[in-house]
């Protein structure tokens, strides 16, 4: 670990409690440099040293009992946690010799010596409180491999501990292209089914890797929290069905996320016209805009359709489209005032860790009843802006309201004598960019400057032609 998993789970918990200092962080790491990095990252993010308990040790060989280092024998007691997160090395070799009676593994079985994935999982699970939750990142093989792993998987299912399985996009972790899943486990559950989620299609390319966007993550979280069936994305699977599949949890057995095959209409390709099934495929739009389909297409006697002239004008002027736009505007009436109240009027006291979720819920509520709009695309737009807004709010709360008026040197990197050097190039607002101030307080002057710059550009263009 380097601390990122701990920080993420800590931030998530902080949204639901009044005092983040109540959160205590435990971590164990084998590599000395990573262990040091973990402690440093936690301290740098404002975690109090008293709330950090880390050990530099082998997790599989040295279980984590809670004891005082100077007197381990007399201060031993098991450690049980509210939340456990883990991203162990994949399919690492280990030595299970003599561990049959280890309380971490005794209930479920020993992982094979060639693959320690389930050893890490059972270690984490042992330290979970009865009402706690655990998530662990693992390779797909843990879902279907047989032998000792199949026995452990069966025991976990029969004891009703596997809450959800989430298939992730490939190549999202640096240093490995191994496809991975997140397994969610609980000690006690009210239901006996397992939620299977195939989130492998939700990502964007980022260099050589794939990256989960905030909207992709939010979609996963909402589906898991609601335990929702979503076509081509997630399904609640009964324990009986898993038994029928011999405890094989391979995601494609339960969720088909494949794209519909592309089809070609030979008649339309040869003689023209739009096949009715291709128009039917746009049914969400026809439901959202009643009457628009009939206005856009003329159906020929042969059953194929022709698009009428100037479809853009038909769409933009159609009554159902105008009604849709009005409903959308009405849904967001007062949104600016809502933002002003939450972020501007209370900028010195707002709970930054909770505010994004409050804004998200408000946007989702406004979008209820508005078809076609992807709420997770809206969330992605909010999140991209929130990254800057939250930093500004934290700075105002840390430095005081006057920091809004502060300006800082605008530093840029320029070449000097063949070397990159950082030099000052004017000034910039610490919180509020100059262009916002100018457009808000001096709109006429900004307009005049823009007109002069346009005239200057035109004059230079004319001089070039002479």
Indicate residue ranges for each PLM-predicted region.
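Terminal accessory regions of large proteins
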Residues: 286-288, 293-466
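Hydrophobic beta-strand segment of the Class I
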Residues: 84-85, 134
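Conserved Class I SAM-dependent methyltransferase catalytic core
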Residues: 112-185
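S-adenosyl-L-methionine-dependent nucleic acid methyltransferase catalytic domains
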Residues: 18, 26, 35-36, 40-76, ...
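Flexible, glycine-/basic-rich loop-and-beta segments that form/coincide
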Residues: 174-271
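Short, exposed interaction patches on small structured surface elements
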Residues: 251-283, 422-446
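Conserved nucleotide-binding/hydrolysis micro-motifs of P-loop NTPases
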Residues: 2, 32-33, 60-61, 89-92, ...
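Conserved S-adenosyl-L-methionine
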Residues: 1-83, 91-95, 102-106, 119, ...
């Amino acid at each position: 670990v380097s601390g990122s998993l701990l920080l993420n789970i800590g931030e998530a918990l902080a949204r639901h409690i009044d005092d983040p200092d109540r959160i205590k962080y435990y971590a164990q790491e084998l590599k000395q440099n990573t262990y040091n990095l973990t402690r440093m990252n936690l301290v740098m993010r404002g975690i109090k040293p008293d709330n950090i308990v880390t050990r530099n040790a082998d997790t599989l060989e040295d279980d984590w009992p809670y004891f005082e280092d100077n007197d381990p024998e007399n201060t031993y007691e098991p450690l049980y946690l509210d939340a456990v997160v883990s991203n162990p090395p994949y399919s690492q070799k280990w030595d299970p010799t003599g561990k049959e009676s280890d309380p971490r593994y005794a209930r479920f079985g020993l992982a094979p010596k060639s693959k320690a994935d389930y050893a890490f999982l059972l270690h984490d699970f042992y330290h979970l409180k009865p009402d706690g939750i655990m998530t662990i990142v693992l390779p797909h093989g843990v879902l279907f491999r047989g032998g000792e792993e199949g026995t452990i998987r069966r025991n976990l299912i029969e004891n009703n501990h596997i809450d959800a399985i989430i298939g992730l996009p490939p190549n999202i972790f640096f240093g490995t292209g191994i496809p991975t899943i997140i397994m969610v486990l609980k000690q006690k559950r009210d239901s006996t089914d397992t939620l299977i989620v195939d989130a492998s299609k939700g990502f964007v390319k980022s260099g050589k890797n794939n990256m989960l966007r905030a909207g992709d993550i939010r979609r996963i979280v909402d589906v898991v929290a609601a335990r929702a069936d979503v076509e081509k994305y997630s399904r609640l699977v009964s324990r009986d069905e898993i038994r029928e599949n011999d405890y094989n949890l391979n995601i494609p057995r339960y969720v088909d996320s494949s794209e519909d095959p592309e089809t070609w209409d030979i008649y339309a390709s040869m003689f023209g016209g739009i096949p009715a099934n291709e128009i039917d495929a746009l049914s969400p739009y026809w439901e959202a805009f009643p009457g628009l389909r009939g206005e856009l297409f003329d159906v020929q006697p042969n059953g194929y359709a022709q698009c009428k002239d100037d479809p853009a004008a038909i769409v933009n002027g159609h009554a159902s489209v105008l009604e849709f736009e009005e409903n959308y505007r009405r849904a967001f009436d007062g949104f600016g005032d809502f933002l002003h109240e939450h972020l501007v009027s209370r900028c010195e006291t707002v709970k930054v860790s909770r505010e994004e979720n409050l804004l998200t819920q408000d946007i989702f509520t406004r979008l209820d009843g508005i078809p076609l709009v992807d709420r997770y695309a809206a969330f992605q737009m909010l999140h991209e802006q929130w990254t800057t807004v939250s930093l500004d709010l934290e700075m105002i709360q840390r430095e005081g309201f006057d920091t809004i008026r502060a300006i800082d040197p605008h530093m840029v990197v320029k070449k000097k004598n063949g070397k990159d050097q950082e030099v000052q190039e004017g000034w910039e607002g610490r919180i509020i960019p100059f262009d916002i101030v100018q457009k808000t307080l001096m709109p006429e002057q900004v307009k005049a400057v823009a007109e002069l710059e346009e005239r200057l550009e035109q004059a230079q263009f004319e001089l070039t032609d002479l």
